[in-house]
């Protein structure tokens, strides 16, 4: 279960959930407030009317959908609570029937993207030099460096504050003891402050859902402000775009992973960072990777409780990583990692080499069954937090047409980029974890390098000046990458947790099981896209973000081919669900049509 930490200085905000009063804190998201109050099921699925609750808390999974003031399909993790707000369980497809008669709920003006203030639109004087998408370390560094070069820059991000997921909530922390998050979290403050001083226009609360090249060589981005009383959308025109959309947690498709109370470790960390909500008794953490140990340490330091940590790192993986140990030991990750693991092991039960997991329960998680070398055991729990690493969140770049390649070391697809982050699409750079997962320390230098390359391409300075300015960033990147090969080898997710079996859910949105996907493949489906057409896997509101890695793994195993041959979903615009009101708010122009419909005039 979860509990709110004491000494939260924020004022109380009251709203209702299914008619019952709920006390939140100002700044809480709807989803965070509900979880803190013990409400873990927020919607019923359209297909089988099964209860679901938040999985990711970062706007990717759509399992936190609720009805707000009569408006359905609202992501509870992206909307702040307001006094008197009426929140209701979203009850499957029936909720959609009421949408047409419901006025859009209002949100705080500070959340609404002031599109006029960013100077974008169809006017000839509205052309940006660089549009940056994403306000994490890579995006903040890119925007700041580009502004320092004298370029006209705007940054767009879905969150209300800058910082990205890694530094989520850094500008408005509710924690009375900030040290529980660790020094690395607060180091992001310097990036945020530099960005705020840069004068870059910040489109907060903005969803960028289309990116397309134009005939004149510029790029067009469709941007919307979300479900407001008067939806605002615009066509942002830029000479260059830097996609810095970060990473998202890899799906963990084990039996029962869709039960309310089963969440990603990253979701629990976001609850701590943004709402001062911590896991307490009845919590089990399972999986592998640095974030697993980091959150366990943060939770315990904050006063939370972890009943057990089930480590799924396979036997023999440490021996396989040893050839990379020298570089790792010279990195700052070694000492930090040792201290995290030592502290957690001293304060909670750790089970190593777990090779099987299943969440138990009917309408919510009630326990976890796990196996070690064929021996099975179980633990009672009401909260199960899962993590098996992260993958690039590059949906926007993929939909725009950027080439991708399989990274076998990290078991994921990633955009193909040059040493500056330049993609295969002219004028588009991909920076930070959106291009290759290497953590926050590497993200900021990569964002800066992308900005320098874009400035050079736009004629702001020559290649020699670009190279001179890049030297400190190259040095910082080299330091950040030292030891990454050890981490990638040690924590590469085991196939047992990437390839679901039988009736295990592969697609959370459409409730498609692994066996249905396998049946489609054996019936002749040639890959993820045909399997999608036959089963609806990947057709839900998350648009394949959560099941794409799973489909690649299922196709590769079932068809006996490599992941490269299996491929992944073909991404389309809009890359995020948008309302008809947001579409209608776009300017009526050929440029807008081309950006939204991805019209290829050469065909």
Question: Model-derived features: where do they sit?
Answer:
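N-terminal intrinsically disordered, low-complexity segments enriched in P/E/S/T
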Residues: 21-23
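Residues forming the flavin
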Residues: 2-13, 26, 31-50, 59-60, ...
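Cys/His-rich Zn2+-binding cysteine-cluster or related metal-binding knuckle/ribbon modules and their
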Residues: 54
């Amino acid at each position: 279960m979860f509990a709110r930490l004491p000494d939260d200085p924020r004022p109380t905000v009251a709203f209702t959930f299914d008619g019952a009063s709920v006390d939140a804190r100002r700044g809480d998201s709807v989803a965070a407030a509900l979880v803190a109050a013990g409400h873990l099921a927020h919607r019923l699925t359209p297909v089988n009317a099964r209860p679901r609750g938040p999985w990711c808390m970062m706007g990717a999974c759509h399992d936190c959908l609720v009805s707000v003031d009569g408006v359905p399909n609202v992501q509870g993790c992206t909307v702040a609570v307001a006094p008197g707000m009426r929140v209701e369980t979203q009850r499957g497809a029936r909720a959609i029937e009421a949408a047409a008669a419901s006025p859009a709920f209002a949100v705080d003006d500070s959340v609404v993207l002031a599109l006029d203030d960013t100077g974008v639109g169809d006017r000839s004087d509205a052309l940006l030099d660089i549009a940056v998408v994403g306000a994490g370390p890579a995006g903040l560094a890119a925007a700041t460096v580009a502004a320092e070069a004298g370029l006209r820059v705007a940054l767009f991000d879905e969150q209300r504050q800058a910082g990205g997921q890694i530094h989520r909530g850094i500008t408005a922390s509710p924690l009375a003891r900030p040290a529980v998050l660790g020094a690395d979290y607060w180091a992001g403050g310097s990036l945020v402050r530099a960005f705020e001083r840069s004068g870059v226009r910040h489109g907060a609360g903005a969803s960028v859902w289309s990116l397309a090249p134009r005939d004149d060589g510029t790029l067009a981005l469709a941007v919307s402000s979300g479900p407001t009383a008067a939806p605002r959308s615009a066509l942002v025109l830029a000479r260059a775009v830097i996609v810095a959309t970060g990473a998202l947690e890899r799906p963990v498709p084990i039996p029962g992973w869709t039960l309310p109370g089963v969440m990603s470790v990253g979701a629990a960390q976001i609850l701590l960072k943004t709402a001062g909500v911590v896991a307490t008794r009845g919590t089990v953490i399972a999986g592998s990777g640095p974030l697993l140990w980091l959150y366990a340490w943060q939770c315990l330091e904050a006063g939370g409780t972890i009943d057990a940590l089930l480590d799924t790192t396979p036997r023999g993986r440490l021996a396989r990583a040893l050839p990379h140990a020298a570089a790792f030991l010279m990195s700052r990750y070694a000492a930090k990692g040792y201290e995290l693991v030592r502290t957690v092991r001293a304060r909670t039960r750790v089970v190593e080499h777990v090779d099987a997991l299943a969440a138990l329960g009917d309408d919510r998680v009630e326990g976890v069954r796990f196996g070690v070398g064929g021996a099975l055991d179980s633990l009672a729990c009401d909260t199960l937090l899962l993590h098996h690493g992260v993958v690039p969140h590059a949906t926007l770049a993929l939909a725009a047409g950027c080439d991708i390649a399989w990274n076998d070391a990290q078991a994921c697809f990633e955009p193909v980029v040059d040493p500056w982050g330049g993609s295969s699409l002219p004028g588009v750079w991909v920076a930070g974890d959106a291009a290759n997962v290497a953590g926050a320390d590497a993200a900021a230098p990569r964002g800066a390098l992308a900005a320098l390359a874009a400035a050079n391409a736009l004629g702001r300075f020559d290649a020699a000046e670009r190279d001179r300015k890049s030297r400190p960033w190259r040095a910082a990147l080299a330091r950040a990458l030292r030891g990454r090969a050890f981490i990638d080898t040690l924590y590469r997710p085991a196939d047992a947790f990437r390839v679901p079996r039988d009736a295990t859910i592969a697609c959370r949105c459409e409730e498609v099981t692994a066996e249905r996907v396998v049946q489609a493949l054996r019936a002749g489906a040639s890959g993820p896209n045909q399997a999608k057409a036959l089963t609806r896997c990947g057709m839900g509101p998350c648009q394949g973000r959560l099941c794409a890695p799973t489909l690649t793994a299922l196709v590769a195993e079932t068809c006996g081919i490599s992941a490269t041959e299996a491929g992944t979903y073909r991404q389309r615009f809009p890359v995020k669900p948008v309302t008809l009101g947001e579409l209608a708010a776009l300017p009526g122009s050929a440029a807008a049509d081309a950006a939204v419909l991805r019209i290829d005039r050469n065909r």
